[in-house]
Regions:
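Conserved beta-strand position immediately N-terminal to the Walker
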Residues: 13-14, 54
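NTP-binding/hydrolysis catalytic cores, primarily Walker-type P-loop NTPases
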Residues: 220-234
Length: 234
């Protein structure tokens, strides 16, 4: 079963990776809003009907930066407070596992977004055992409560401009191995407003679904629109 059709399987660990400045945080914030607003789809991908509560753990942006983004996103539109109350932002990450466990054990939560993995993981990123034991804490929460956890993470600088693939992820292969789905967001070579959303790993999709990117346009609201284009990854 998918929380977001084709992209994010329910009750699993997943990742959105890419170079800096591609709009990864914006994409995940937009997904969070789509869920809590009760939308039927996110960028054309069907959303599962469920309780629509989201926790967003933000290590890079504080309250000020988050509210700037929200104001930009909504523009002239008045945000619906009753819907927004279903999205909880967490800025203090001390004791985060214990706190997340407490919240999801007493509330129905669909999605936990970790933005970003590199800030929360304090071990050696190239040590598979350390990476695995860190991710297992989140995996246990996902398995126990059926909540989906999406990590925002970066790709290696050396992989810039290369064909999107899961070997470009920064750090140990242990990270990718724990993920059921890995999405990669890349910049278009010729149009700076375009991004390519690529499925570089998904245990539940045929290879044919992973061979082409979905072309997105980054708009003036710091959010994405889906275009009708798909482009071969190679």
């Amino acid at each position: 079963e998918f929380l977001v059709d084709k992209l994010i399987p329910q009750g699993t660990l997943c990742a959105l990776v890419g170079e800096s400045d591609t709009g990864k945080s914006s994409l995940l914030r937009q997904l969070a809003l789509s869920l809590v607003y009760g939308d039927n789809d996110f960028l054309g991908f069907k959303l599962k009907e469920s309780c629509r509560n989201v926790i967003y753990v933000s290590t890079e942006d504080g309250e000020m930066a988050t509210s700037v983004w929200l104001n930009k996103y909504f523009g002239e539109e008045i945000a619906k407070d009753d819907r927004l109350s279903k999205l909880k932002y967490v800025y203090n990450t001390e004791g985060i596992i214990k706190n997340l466990r407490e919240v999801v054990s007493t509330n129905c939560v669909d999605l936990i977004i970790i933005d970003s993995y590199a800030d929360l993981f304090t071990g050696s990123m190239n040590n598979s055992n350390e990476v695995r034991s860190f991710l297992n804490m989140y995996n246990n929460i996902a398995n126990e409560f059926g909540v989906t956890v999406v990590f925002l993470h970066h790709t290696k600088k050396a992989s810039a401009g290369m064909v999107p693939n899961k070997n470009s992820i920064l750090g140990s292969q242990g990270f990718e191995a724990k993920m059921r789905s890995v999405l990669m967001l890349t910049q278009d070579d010729s149009d700076e407003s375009l991004r390519h959303l690529c499925i570089v790993k998904n245990n539940y999709l045929p290879e044919s679904e992973k061979s082409m990117s979905y072309v997105l346009r980054f708009n003036q609201y710091l959010a994405f629109d889906i275009t009708s284009d798909r482009v071969k990854l190679n």
